[in-house]
Amino acid sequence: MSYGGGYGGGGYGGGYGGGGGGGGYGGGGGGYGGGYGGGGYGGGFGGDRMGNLGQGLHNIDWQNQSLAKFEKNFYVQDPRVTARSDAEVEAFRAEKEMKIQGKNVPRPITTFEEAGFPDYIMSEIRRMGFTAPSSIQCQAWPMALSGRDLVAIAETGSGKTISFCLPAMVHINAQPLLAPGDGPIVLILAPTRELAVQIQTEATKFGQSSRIRNTAIYGGAPKGPQIRDLQRGVEICVATPGRLIDMLETGKTNLKRVTYLVMDEADRMLDMGFEPQIRKIVSQIRPDRQTLLFSATWPKEVQRLAMDFLHDFIQVNIGSLDLTANHNVAQHVEVCTDFDKRSKLLSHLEKISQENGKVLIFVATKRVADDLTKFLRMDGWPALAIHGDKQQAERDWVLAEFKSGRSPIMLATDVASRGLDVRDIGYVINYDFPNNCEDYIHRIGRTGRAGRKGTSYTYFTMDNSKAARELVQILRESKADIPPELEEMAMYGGRGGGGGRGRGGRGGGRGGYGGGGGRGGYSSGANSYGGGGGGYSSRW
């Protein structure tokens, strides 16, 4: 199909312009033109400034605080669950690749009805057309509803958000109503703004009928509406650590009413350097809270966090704790040079375009994201880019275009992509291999979600040879084809999975909405939709 008209002349510029990051909406085409101006913070992780956040927050002496009692155990085991033999329970857990640890772990449920959710949640589940709970939900719901601290390890796209959101609704409805000046009852920490918004969307769906209010607090967006939400009172606050600490330090909210704490994608939050902020936030929450920690992996750093913050916790792992890929994703690795990548990409896009599938292309840097997007759009491909230096309004627009299928090709950096909830991505292309194989697993986990099949293509160069051995192990475990060149690299190349993740630098400011100027701005090509005479004819 071809795209015509529609966007009347103005795409966004997005080039690396000189100057001071010009403000204001530019004239003419109205696109985003500004480059990266001088100074300022380059967006980093979800817009949160790392700095010395939390210095103004004092630890609370909880021993001398008068704390109101609260209820957190709401679980009544369904008679059908009780009637199952131990052998049946073990067989079900084995079938779902479910491993448990801890004392007195509740039995898993097998249907939504067995969870014992109230009618206002069950009606929403039925309306959304879910047929059966996912593996993580079968075990995590009884654990969470029983009021226990829990650790849940499961791959991205496994239904983790619903696993903690629905018990949160039950928890809130059993607590006293918020009084003026009260902070939230449920706090959900997430690494990125995209994941925070995704969680908020699910909380809104299931909280409407019981009038549970929520807000998402994250950097890169105006503080005003977020402050208003907090001051009016919300039962659920979904937040990235940096912006939340900002709100706490300036007295815009407090965490004295929090009795249900969730840390989602805990491994990623630690990777991104948020541990000091997380520790400062948790110090502001009463120690007898219920704490739930969700993570895709279980490295030592996450284990230490769990030991410090959770009490007598129970744990469920879905699948192996070894680094394994989603088996619903067909993995294809091609060993090549950097010079070969563009031609390989075009070849794969030609093939994929016959199926009208959505494609997520991962690149290493913001510059590559912008340059490659420009190259693809000049060649007629409907591609857009998302990364940490883009304004929030632009990121939201790009994501909406991708989700709707109007622009079915999206380029992304790792930080921008984590937590993106686009369920019908058919293909992932690793244009640049990530720093380590853990990120490779997360990347290809963007496709093959919710039981669907997906495909990944990965371009692997000599510069990536340190990761060859671990990648071969992942491919072998998935029964995927292993290129001979990759096996050779694994035999003779470096050991381990490559260097650790970088912290993401302080880029030169954000740049404003300009008029398409600046060196390399794309308002006349790469990212602009042609107006007037019917736009460009897409290859899609």
Swiss-Prot record:
Cellular-component GO terms for this entry: cytoplasm; nucleus; ribonucleoprotein complex
Chain positions covered by the region annotation RNA-binding RGG-box: 492-519
Record's keyword annotation contains Glycosyltransferase: no
Gene for this chain: DBP2
Gene Ontology MF terms: ATP binding; ATP hydrolysis activity; mRNA binding; RNA helicase activity
Ranges for domain Helicase C-terminal: 344-490
Catalysis: reaction(s): ATP + H2O = ADP + phosphate + H(+)
PROSITE patterns: DEAD_ATP_HELICASE, HELICASE_ATP_BIND_1, HELICASE_CTER, Q_MOTIF
Region of interest: Disordered: 494-540
Enzyme Commission designation: 3.6.4.13
Location of the motif DEAD box: 264-267
Key words of the record: ATP-binding, Cytoplasm, Helicase, Hydrolase, Nonsense-mediated mRNA decay, Nucleotide-binding, Nucleus, Ribosome biogenesis, RNA-binding, rRNA processing
Subcellular localization: Cytoplasm; Nucleus
SMART domains: DEXDc, HELICc
Origin superkingdom: Eukaryota
SUPFAM superfamilies: P-loop containing nucleoside triphosphate hydrolases
Motif (Q motif): 110-138
Protein name: ATP-dependent RNA helicase DBP2-A
Organism encoding this protein: Cryptococcus neoformans var. neoformans serotype D (strain JEC21 / ATCC MYA-565)
InterPro entries per UniProt: DEAD/DEAH_box_helicase_dom, Helicase_ATP-bd, Helicase_C-like, P-loop_NTPase, RNA-helicase_DEAD-box_CS, RNA_helicase_DEAD_Q_motif
PANTHER family assigned: ATP-DEPENDENT RNA HELICASE DBP3
GO biological process, one term: nuclear-transcribed mRNA catabolic process, nonsense-mediated decay
Assembly, per entry: Associates with polysomes.
Functional summary from the UniProt entry: ATP-dependent RNA helicase involved nonsense-mediated mRNA decay and ribosome biogenesis through rRNA processing.
A Pfam family reported for this protein in Swiss-Prot or TrEMBL: Helicase_C
Domain-related comment: The Q motif is unique to and characteristic of the DEAD box family of RNA helicases and controls ATP binding and hydrolysis.
